[in-house]
Amino acid sequence: MNNSNEHRREEAGAANEQMPYNKAVKSAYADVLKDKMNREQEISLRAIKKGIYTDGGETDNYDMDKENDSAYEMFKKNLDFPLDQHNDDDDDDPYIEDNGQETDGYSDEDYTDEADKSFIEDSDSDSYDLESNSDFEENLESSGEAKKLKWRTYIFYGGLFFVFYFFGSFLMTTVKNNDLESHSSGATSSPGKSFSNLQKQVNHLYSELSKRDEKHSSELDKTVKIIVSQFEKNIKRLLPSNLVNFENDINSLTKQVETISTSMSELQRRNHKFTVENVTQWQDQLVKQLDTHLPQEIPVVINNSSSLLIIPELHNYLSALISDVIESPGIGTAGSAESRWEYDLNRYVKEILSNELQYIDKDYFIQEMNRRLQSNKQEIWEEITNRLETQQQQQQQQVQQDYSNVPQQYSSILMKRLIHQIYNSNQHQWEDDLDFATYVQGTKLLNHLTSPTWRQGSGVQPIELLTDSKQSSSTYWQCENEPGCSWAIRFKTPLYLTKISYMHGRFTNNLHIMNSAPRLISLYVKLSQTKEIKALQTLANQYGFGQHHKRDRNYIKIAKFEYRLTDSRIRQQMYLPPWFIQLKPLVRSIVFQVDENYGNKKFISLRKFIINGVTPQDLQIIENNEFPVLLGDTPEYGVTQNTDEGKRKVLLSKPPYASSSTSTKFHPASNVPSFGQDELDQ
């Protein structure tokens, strides 16, 4: 019996080892409570993720929770009641312990009052924070409050889930921000390294581009050299060996083509035959043009024979107008002059002083000219016909001429004569009139009207400006740059002024002479007869002049001149006003006043004034025709080449009124151009 009891107790112990109440109280309670909490958490998580809150789901969860609660209640009851209430018949027999005492078969020493007490104490001192759960357990004793506890549990775990969810998202955001800040701080912590890396990359790219450009340029240079060499080879093959002769041939052919084209164009324009009627039409057209463009008063020269002579400017104007009328393609629109005819009275001061320059009415001039053209119409027609025939013959001969010969060359003798003629022409432009601004002509300096000399200058006195030496190109008088630097002279014999000029050098390095050169020069004159001063002043006031000099009121301002350093002419003329020329006053002394220079504020540099004029004795000789006017060839200032070239021809047919400037229009020497350092003014 004892063996059977022991066997039964072993089976009961093995079967009851799996039950929570067969374990230690503390561990059993913790396992059951943990299992329940895990199941409730899994159920709430699945419900939140899937969003299943239907009635069926709530029912299932409620059944599962009910089963769990019943198991938990059973465990509690087993703890409160002894295990003697069972229907097993085998357990009715008392169990005899080793000590001889009888006990029930299912009694256990573990389930004593002390065990219950220890279970309660262990549950109160449990390490888990389950105070709320212990309260929850007490409330489960009543079945009416179980349902409320279930919903509170759901709300609690749902709130806990949301707290964990937001806390996790906050942690993730914080981590990301920390990563970004660490990244930015890491980026900003090493700006030098980033800049150096960028600089290295840029330098590398620049070096690559430079190498590429050098490579392309070298390849381009090689290609260009090859092309140029090939081009030179091809050109050398095409060009003849003697390039000079080839160039001469090309020039000759070009001239032939130009000549042929000119002759053809002229022949096309002149396709009509010259007749007397055409000449009459030209005459009528010429008269109309003269009537339109000529002024109302025509200046002419009347010599001793009372014959009318036109001045050279009018002669040139008529020649150009006649050529324009003849060469025009149509008669009706031919001969339109570009501008009105103008002339300069400064060229005819001598003729005005001798009363040879007079004015006639335009109608009388045109009538006289028309009468002479009418009487010589046949002669003009014959002359034109002969000239055209001669020109056509020359053109035909020129076209048929062989230009393959050696081009013509100038003779060395002809070249020497041409150079000699140019030299004489230039020299004669300087020597054709006396310079009265020299002390050798008796002119004296007026010290009381002359400005003081600049003390820090070269020491040249104003009297040096009266020297007659052409070698004194470096002689410059420097006066103080006071308001109006003056230089005054007095003639030995009163003069009729014909031309006044000033001469100043051109220097490349000595710029203090250039910026102190006079720019604006005023001319003051004192008349020989005091009774004419008032008339001169009244006339000058009408043209904006007539002011008195600040040091002497007897000197009257008649002109103002601007000397231009930009002009290549070193000798520039101070033109006399026409009203002064027509008044014909006799001048006793002159004052030149420099109103402005080219920028020097300390001093003004003056070199040379040239004054040309005629005396009353010269006019008397001209009026009486006591000495013939010498015209023709230019006088020889150098060595004569033969006796015939040095002769002066006396042209008695020419009127005695012509001056040197006027006579140069009638001989070839005046038309020869000047060159080099000998270039002088016209």
Swiss-Prot record:
Stretches that traverse the bilayer: 155-175
Subcellular location: Nucleus inner membrane; Cytoplasm, Cytoskeleton, Microtubule organizing center, Spindle pole body; Chromosome, Telomere
Ranges in the topological domain labelled Lumenal: 176-682
Result of altering W487A: Defective in spindle pole body duplication at 37 degrees Celsius
InterPro entries: SUN1-5 (IPR045119), SUN_dom (IPR012919)
Domain SUN: from-to ranges: 427-616
Changes after translation: Phosphorylation at Ser-189 and Ser-190 by CDC7 and CDC28 during meiosis regulates of the localization on nuclear envelope for meiotic chromosome motion and nuclear envelope remodeling.
Keyword field contains Disulfide bond: no
Positions contributing to ATP binding: A187, T188, S189, S190, P191, G192, K193, S194
Coiled coil: 241-273
Residue span of region Interaction with JEM1: 431-650
Gene Ontology CC annotation, any one: cytoplasm
GO BP terms in the entry: establishment of mitotic sister chromatid cohesion; homologous chromosome pairing at meiosis; karyogamy; meiotic telomere clustering; mitotic sister chromatid cohesion; nuclear migration involved in conjugation with cellular fusion; spindle pole body duplication; subtelomeric heterochromatin formation
Record topological domains on the Nuclear side: 1-154
Region annotated Disordered, chain positions: 1-23, 82-111, 641-682
Annotated spans, Interaction with CDC31: 171-682
Membrane topology per record: Single-pass type II membrane protein
Molecular-function annotations in GO: ATP binding; protein-membrane adaptor activity
Residue ranges with Acidic residues bias: 87-111
Record's compositionally biased regions (Basic and acidic residues): 1-12
UniProt KW keywords: ATP-binding, Cell cycle, Chromosome, Coiled coil, Cytoplasm, Cytoskeleton, Membrane, Nucleotide-binding, Nucleus, Phosphoprotein, Signal-anchor, Telomere, Transmembrane, Transmembrane helix
Consequence of changing Q572L: Defective in spindle pole body duplication at 37 degrees Celsius
Subunit structure, interactors included: Component of the linker nucleocytoskeleton and cytoskeleton (LINC) complex composed of at least MPS2, MPS3 and CSM4. Interacts with HTZ1. Interacts with REC8. Interacts with CSM4; ECO1, EST1, JEM1, CDC31, NDJ1, MPS2 and SIR4.
Annotated domain remarks: The SUN domain is involved in the binding to MPS2 and is important for modulating chromosome motion events that act in meiotic chromosome juxtaposition and by extension, promoting proper morphogenesis of the synaptonemal complex.
Functional note: Component of the linker nucleocytoskeleton and cytoskeleton (LINC) complex that regulates telomere movement and meiotic recombination during meiosis. Connects the spindle pole body with the nuclear envelope through its interaction with MPS2 and mediates meiotic bouquet formation and rapid chromosome movements in meiotic prophase. Functions as an integral membrane anchor for telomeres and is a nuclear receptor for the SIR4 pathway of telomere tethering and gene inactivation. Essential for nuclear division and fusion and required for the first step of spindle pole body duplication in G1.
Protein name per UniProt: Spindle pole body assembly component MPS3
